[in-house]
């Protein structure tokens, strides 16, 4: 057993007897359970459903675990309770999982982003279950008057082997609730896990496939009105005039008015960013009526002072110019200038990628019911914790009067990190004095969005006469953001290294997109490494392993972000599982490996050209994400990341003309189709006992690099510019 100190206080655990039917209720913060604070026994709040993270044990032995983090398809609503249940030592069949509301008084980091939920919650989740288990054992020891070390548990039952006594958790729950929270608990050895590491089906699975209400668009409250927003058609425009006479006269329309997204510049936080200030709101009884009235609006727009309309051609020109000039030096090892001057060979490559729209299957929406006393909000968001303050400020209500309930999200990919639509819904409800559901159309979502930036990267490598890599140079930038990760591989593996970056200002709103920065850098870096390996006459996997061995044996610098052993491990595993070097004669192979969000993924892509089109036959994946909590869900995430990565690199782009997005719906914004998905995807995990690391984002970036390298083998030409399909 591993002994862990609980250091439990109010923010970590709340223990009390459950009001209805006795039993034990243990509320906890996944993250705060390991922090130091004075221990205090507290009675359970009368409104127990307001507690965020909690564990409730009823008299019948049923265990209810509330999952506090937003569920976005990353399976935390299943995986987090699995961790608690394993340490509690309860039968998974006896566990009921519920989605918790926002409650910043009890919980910390209540968001979905950065592939952090399991990684940061791992220890706290385990301790929550282990603490409850010890309290149940203590209750049994006191009841039976036997030593605690003679008490064991198994699948929700407490045993005293010597006397033959046993009792279910439900029978002991009320007594356990009276016991002081222990200062130390015993965590299981990894070999003793019963639930962690086994495949459990998604707790929402049945509701999803049978169409039960789960998502924000499903939410309904009697008397609820529908709202939609008209915004400027292009970036760099603002509202000049409104003619809403026709719209107001249409059936079912309650009101038409204008709102300002922000009262002042101080409200423009990253989490509630919006592209436009002037928004024209239409409110009515039904979606159809509001949609028709919105179309009837006669709106006139004018340029924002000092803002010029932007075009994709302008973006390309500006990035090419910036990429050709020295940038800000972020890291420099050795003397790269001298190494390049004395090189036997110099390899260069320039890579670009366009703006991308998130295109969540469920467009942005949120419900708000604001009164003079309180505000109730319900809907899909990745950052409920961040938005609470913005909503409070806009409404003039104290934080304790803001209630945010989370629904399951129909996709996020970073788009729902930015909750301006939550603020908009709240402001609209306050204005019309009625409950309102704000709905974005697909066109609204794509033109009123927060986009993946357009990126650019220039690479240069030097080889000596023996084809050893002697210098490496990367200069990366983009529209308002740079994808540079200066301390990642191959930094640390080469004596002479230079990393620079630059950015270009723009009035187009950008933000996080699945695996921010990495979603471009992995493609560019891994494509270039293949080109360098070819110039050196080396196998691409062997070349990478050679560099990683240098990083292990004699690393350059002290700030390298990655673990070279784990990095090499996924390359070796994918080499084995793919049968590298033994591929079918009609298939062309590409490989890539990348580190992000504390995890390592390597891919091999098998491709053929059939009827002039690329057809992906196989994708082999080797993944090191530490302990795999739920293999079935982990495989699903990797498969999804592979398909998503291939689709965006091959087909997707968002272009601009006079500041206006040219792709506004799925008819002209290209996404991967079922027929274009890989025919086979294999997933293999590196087995170790490292605490879990990120998994929602790491599978996404590297497969794009493997795709580019497979395309080269299949077509004989390098693919430097996304989307690749335009050059095939």
Q: Model-derived features: where do they sit?
A:
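Cofactor-binding beta-sheet edge motifs in enzyme active sites
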Residues: 2-26, 35-728
């Amino acid at each position: 057993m591993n002994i862990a100190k609980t250091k439990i206080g109010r923010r970590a655990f709340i223990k009390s007897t459950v009001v209805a039917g006795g039993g034990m209720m243990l509320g906890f913060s996944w993250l705060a359970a390991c922090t130091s604070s004075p221990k205090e026994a507290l009675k359970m709040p009368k409104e127990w459903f307001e507690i965020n993270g909690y564990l409730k044990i009823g008299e019948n032995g049923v265990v209810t675990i509330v999952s506090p983090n937003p569920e976005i398809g990353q399976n935390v609503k299943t995986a987090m309770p699995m961790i608690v249940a394993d340490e509690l030592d309860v039968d998974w069949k006896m566990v009921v999982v519920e989605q918790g509301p926002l409650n910043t008084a009890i919980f910390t980091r209540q968001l979905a982003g950065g592939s952090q939920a399991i990684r940061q919650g791992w220890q706290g989740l385990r301790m929550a279950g282990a603490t409850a288990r010890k309290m149940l054992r203590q209750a049994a020891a006191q009841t039976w008057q036997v030593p605690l070390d003679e008490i064991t548990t198994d699948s929700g039952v407490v045993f005293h082997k010597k006397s033959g006594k046993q009792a279910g958790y439900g029978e002991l729950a009320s007594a356990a609730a009276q016991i002081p929270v222990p200062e130390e608990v015993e965590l299981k050895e990894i070999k003793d896990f019963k639930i962690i590491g086994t495949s459990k089906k998604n707790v929402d699975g049945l509701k999803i496939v049978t169409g039960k209400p789960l998502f924000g668009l499903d939410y309904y409250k009697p008397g609820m009105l529908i709202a939609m927003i008209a915004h400027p058609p292009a970036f760099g425009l603002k509202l000049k005039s409104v003619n809403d006479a026709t719209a107001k006269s249409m059936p079912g329309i309650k009101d038409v008015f204008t709102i300002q997204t922000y009262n002042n510049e101080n409200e423009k936080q990253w989490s509630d960013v919006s592209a436009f200030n002037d928004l024209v709101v239409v409110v009515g009884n039904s979606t159809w009526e509001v949609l028709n009235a919105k179309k009837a609006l006669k709106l006139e727009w004018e340029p924002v002072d000092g803002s010029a309309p932007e075009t994709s051609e302008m973006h390309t020109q500006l990035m090419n110019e910036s990429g050709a000039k020295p940038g800000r030096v972020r890291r420099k090892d050795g003397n790269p200038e001298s190494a390049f001057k004395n090189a036997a060979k110099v390899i260069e490559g320039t890579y670009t990628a366009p703006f991308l729209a998130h295109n969540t299957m469920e467009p942005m929406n949120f419900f708000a019911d604001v009164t003079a006393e309180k505000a109730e909000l319900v809907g899909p968001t990745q950052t409920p914790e961040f938005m609470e303050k913005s909503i409070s400020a806009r409404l003039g209500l104290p934080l304790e009067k803001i209630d945010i309930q989370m629904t399951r999200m129909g996709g996020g990919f970073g788009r729902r990190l930015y909750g301006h639509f939550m603020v908009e819904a709240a402001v609209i409800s306050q204005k019309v004095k009625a409950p309102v559901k704000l709905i974005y159309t697909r066109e609204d979502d794509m033109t009123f969005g927060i986009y993946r930036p357009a990126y650019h990267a220039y690479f240069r490598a030097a080889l000596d006469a023996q084809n050893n890599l002697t210098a490496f140079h990367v200069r990366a930038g983009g529209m308002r953001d740079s994808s540079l990760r200066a301390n990642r591989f191959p930094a640390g593996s080469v004596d002479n290294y230079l990393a620079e970056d630059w950015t270009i200002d723009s009035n187009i709103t950008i933000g996080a997109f699945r695996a921010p920065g990495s979603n471009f850098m992995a493609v560019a870096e891994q494509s270039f490494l293949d080109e360098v390996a070819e110039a050196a006459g080396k196998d691409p996997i062997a070349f990478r392993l050679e560099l990683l061995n240098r990083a292990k044996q004699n690393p350059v610098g002290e700030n390298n972000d990655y673990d070279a052993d784990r990095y090499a491990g996924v390359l070796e595993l994918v080499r084995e599982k793919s049968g590298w070097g033994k591929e079918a004669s009609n298939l062309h192979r590409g490989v890539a490996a990348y580190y992000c969000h504390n995890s390592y993924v390597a891919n091999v892509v098998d491709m053929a050209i059939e009827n002039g089109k690329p057809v992906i036959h196989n994708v082999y994946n080797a993944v090191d994400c530490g302990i795999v909590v739920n293999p079935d869900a982990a495989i699903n995430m990797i498969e999804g990341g592979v398909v998503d990565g291939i689709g965006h690199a091959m087909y997707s782009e968002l272009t601009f003309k006079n500041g206006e997005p040219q792709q506004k719906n799925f008819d002209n914004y290209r996404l991967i189709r079922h027929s274009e998905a890989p025919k086979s995807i294999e997933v293999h995990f590196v087995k170790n006992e490292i605490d879990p690391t990120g998994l929602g984002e790491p599978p996404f970036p590297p497969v794009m690099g493997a795709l580019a390298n497979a395309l080269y083998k299949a077509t004989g030409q390098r693919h430097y510019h996304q989307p690749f399909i335009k050059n095939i």
